[in-house]
């Protein structure tokens, strides 16, 4: 019976050596990858056996015996796959696997690996060697590639056998199905190999699987041994050395994991952050692309609409500002075709006078001023006979037109020669003018027949004097007669803006087409040297005269 002291010491060493040394919290979102390192990054690579436990389980769910570096295992839908990265020349040979259960201590052939340009070839069956004979017929056919000096090895029952060193012709390439059936693989240096224990897919079951590498000229090498157990069902995982990776984590993977390697135990706490089922489904199926693309499209449309409305508003404001600041758009001239008398919203507007018509008007004005000096103050002028009317109409084709203020040709009166047989009423505040009328008799002259004209170039302008106000005088600011006399009997638009008042409408009781009614010819009412107009009760009602 052993003494109790050594037993207690051994138990103490076991507890001290097996207690957790480090604890690490690993947080991952649902659907992410859980990475659990068993050793720190600075630890050297060890060939010691490691085991992974979960929770309070007494049986490890994964046991791994590392072999050569650069090897890994993948547990998934195709079975348990041995992963070899960066294949080199010395990795060619026979790869055997062992499953327990059902097989125990029985190694079954898995795959032969042939590395190109390595000088070695491996085959499971001797019948496949005939296709590798490189005679003249096979060389000329072009279906094979000569590998002169390659060493050929064939598996004979439970051991490899040297077939010979004669030249062989390796096939240019074989289909994947043929390679899977024959289990002979030819790879290029630096590629990655995925080897299964049997033809994939191989169902994954709890148990153990081991791999070994056999080469006729080198000793056998144990690669990896993996044992699956535990209470939880087997799930997809990656084992790479001392690193355990659980892809697409779920809430079932949350818990505490222990890694036992030699006398060192590493504890890992895994916390899975839950996500909504819809978001998880979108991530797994790739359906998140649909709402993201829709949202991007809506944002693009909204930005485009806002930009379009902003540009449209800026364009409208710019066009309005340009129109308001353009001096050419401040005044409008209506110039319809000459002589047609087209009616529009401005009334009976004819074409504007040309330079020739302006000169004709000036000549007629000069003749009228020389023959009848007092015709400006007569508001009623008899209409001449039909012959004179037609003659006057032929001379003045422009007819009625709006006057042009600031014109170099002088201001023109408001004329209407198209309807000489009717009474004419002036609406622009200036007197009528008919330069071609003959002098009227004394019986047809009214009280304004001997009144002075607006302007006389040979006389000096009368000084403004005070005037008397009556009910016919314009109210507001004082009226300057010299300003009235500065024109040829017509007020410009600028003067009319300063003198806005309603002219008295005086109607005559006498009937007849030879009398004209006008209320605009009261120019001499405000002369300082004349007397106030007096109303006359006899004769014509609504007229006045000077005494």
Curated annotation (Swiss-Prot):
Principal place of residence: membrane
Post-translational modification: Phosphorylated on tyrosine following B-cell activation. Phosphorylated on tyrosine residues by LYN. Tyrosine residues are phosphorylated sequentially after activation of the B cell receptor. Phosphorylation of Tyr-522 is extremely rapid, followed by phosphorylation at Tyr-402. In contrast, phosphorylation of Tyr-493 appears more slowly and is more transient, returning rapidly to basal levels.
Signal peptide (residue range): 1-16
Sequence positions bearing Phosphoserine: 225
Keyword Metal-binding: no
Primary role: Functions as a coreceptor for the B-cell antigen receptor complex (BCR) on B-lymphocytes. Decreases the threshold for activation of downstream signaling pathways and for triggering B-cell responses to antigens. Activates signaling pathways that lead to the activation of phosphatidylinositol 3-kinase and the mobilization of intracellular Ca(2+) stores. Is not required for early steps during B cell differentiation in the blood marrow. Required for normal differentiation of B-1 cells. Required for normal B cell differentiation and proliferation in response to antigen challenges.
Protein name (record): B-lymphocyte antigen CD19
Designated gene of the protein: Cd19
């Amino acid at each position: 019976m052993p003494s109790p002291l050594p037993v207690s010491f051994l138990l103490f060493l076991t507890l001290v050596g097996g207690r957790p040394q480090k604890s690490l919290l690993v947080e991952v979102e649902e659907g992410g990858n859980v990475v659990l390192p068993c050793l720190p990054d600075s630890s050297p690579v060890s060939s010691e056996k490691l085991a992974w436990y979960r929770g309070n389980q007494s049986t490890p769910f994964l046991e791994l015996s590392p072999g050569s570096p650069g090897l890994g295992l993948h547990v998934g839908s195709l079975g348990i796959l041995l992963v070899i990265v960066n294949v080199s020349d010395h990795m060619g040979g026979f790869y055997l696997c062992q499953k327990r259960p059902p097989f125990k201590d029985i190694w079954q052939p898995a795959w032969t690996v042939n590395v190109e340009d390595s000088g070695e070839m491996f085959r499971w069956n001797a019948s496949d060697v005939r296709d590798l004979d490189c005679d003249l017929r096979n060389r000329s056919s072009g279906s094979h590639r000569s590998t002169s000096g390659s060493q050929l090895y064939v598996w004979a029952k439970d051991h490899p056998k040297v077939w010979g060193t004669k030249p062989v012709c390796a096939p240019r390439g074989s289909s994947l199905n043929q390679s899977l059936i024959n289990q002979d693989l030819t790879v290029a240096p630096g590629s990655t190999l995925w080897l299964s224990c049997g033809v994939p897919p191989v169902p994954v079951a709890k148990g153990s699987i081991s791999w070994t590498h056999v080469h006729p000229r080198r000793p056998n090498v144990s690669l990896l041994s993996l044992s699956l157990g535990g209470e939880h069902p087997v799930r997809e995982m990656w084992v790479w050395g001392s690193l355990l990776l659980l892809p697409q984590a779920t809430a079932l993977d949350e818990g505490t994991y222990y890694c036992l390697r030699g006398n060192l135990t590493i504890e890992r706490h895994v916390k899975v952050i839950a996500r909504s089922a819809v978001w998880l489904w979108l991530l797994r199926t790739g359906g998140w692309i649909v709402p993201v693309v829709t949202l991007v499209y809506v944002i693009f449309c909204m930005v485009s609409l806002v930009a379009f409305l902003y540009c449209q508003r800026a364009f409208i404001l710019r066009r309005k500002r340009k129109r308001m600041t353009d001096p050419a758009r401040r005044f409008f001239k209506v110039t319809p075709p000459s002589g047609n008398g087209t009616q529009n919203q401005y009334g009976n507007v004819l074409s504007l006078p040309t330079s020739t018509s302006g000169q004709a008007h000036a000549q007629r004005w000069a003749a009228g001023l020389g023959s009848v000096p007092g015709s400006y103050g007569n508001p009623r002028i008899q209409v001449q006979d039909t012959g004179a009317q037609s003659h006057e109409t032929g001379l003045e084709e422009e007819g009625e037109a709006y006057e042009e203020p600031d014109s170099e040709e002088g201001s023109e009166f408001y004329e209407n020669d198209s309807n000489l047989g009717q009474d004419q009423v002036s609406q622009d505040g200036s007197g009528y003018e008919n330069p071609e009328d003959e002098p009227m008799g004394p019986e047809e002259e009214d009280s304004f027949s001997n009144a002075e004209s607006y302007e006389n170039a040979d006389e000096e302008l009368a000084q403004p004097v005070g005037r008397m106000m009556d009910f016919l005088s314009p109210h507001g600011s004082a009226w300057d007669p010299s300003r009235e006399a500065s024109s040829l009997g017509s007020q410009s638009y600028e003067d009319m803006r300063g003198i806005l008042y309603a002219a008295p409408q005086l109607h005559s009781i006498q009937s007849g087409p030879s009398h004209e009614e006008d209320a605009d010819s009261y120019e001499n009412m405000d002369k300082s040297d004349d007397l106030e107009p007096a109303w006359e009760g006899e004769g014509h009602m609504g007229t006045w005269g000077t005494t």
